Amino acid sequence: MPTSCYIDKATSTIVGAYFDKQETLNGYYHLFYQILTNYGIPYKLFTDNRTVFNYMSLNPDKRTSDKDVLTQYGYACKQLGIELETSSISQTKGLIERTNGTFQGRLINELKLNGITTINDANKYLIEIFVPDFNKRFAMDYKKFESVFETSPSLDKINYTLAVLTPRKIDNGNSIKYYGKYYQPYLDQELKCFAPKTECLVIKAFNGELLVTIDEQVLDLENYPEMKDFLKNLIMF
């Protein structure tokens, strides 16, 4: 269970921390959510060169388009006007590595002492208890410094900005297959029909809500049962 965190360079304040099974977009979106809701919009995020931050580190064969040089994380930053800078230079990681050493050493001991064994309980303890206490002990009071954070966006804006975008096509049954399930597009509770192979973009919001954009329209997605499940519910005459 890697621990990821963001640190305010000026005050050494941990502004976000999160446990996940591996370092992926999901974990970093949870970090981003903490920053946006608790502190506001930062001027700049400085990260390493891992793929979740730097699209150009992908093998060219795995890129969706040579013109698309932003990761989804980078796209979210752009939408909020945040500068995203990446680097592989080790000396730039000194503050984070020093903080992580103290951070993880104390955290592991506290999780053991409190009998915490699940990732959900670990995140609850990390966010609600450990980070506030850690900042009180080791960081300067960020409120005493001139803030470079802009006002927090609305929760709705955060929810739709921290989204996962996935290209799809409408099939012959006017449905979209997304992670093994079928969905159909609706607008104001009315089914909308499109030609087969129409390109679309599925939007999974931070809260799990699914939407789709088709022909510059934003539509709701409703789960559509697979045919074998549909046939089970037919009444035979």
Residue map of PLM features:
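C-terminal, beta-rich DNA-binding module of retroviral/retroelements integrases
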Residues: V131-F237
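Active-site-proximal structural scaffolding
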Residues: D66-L70, I127, A195
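Short helix-capping and hinge/turn segments at secondary-structure transitions, especially at repeat
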Residues: G105-K112, I116, I127-K143
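Hydrophobic alpha-helical segments, especially N-terminal targeting/anchoring helices
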Residues: I7-D8, K204
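Hydrophobic beta-strand positions
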Residues: Y6-I7, L211
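RNase H-like DDE/DDD metal-dependent nuclease/strand-transfer catalytic core used by mobile genetic elements
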Residues: T3, K9-D121, E226
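Short loop/turn microsegments at loop-to-beta-strand junctions
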Residues: P2-T3, N172
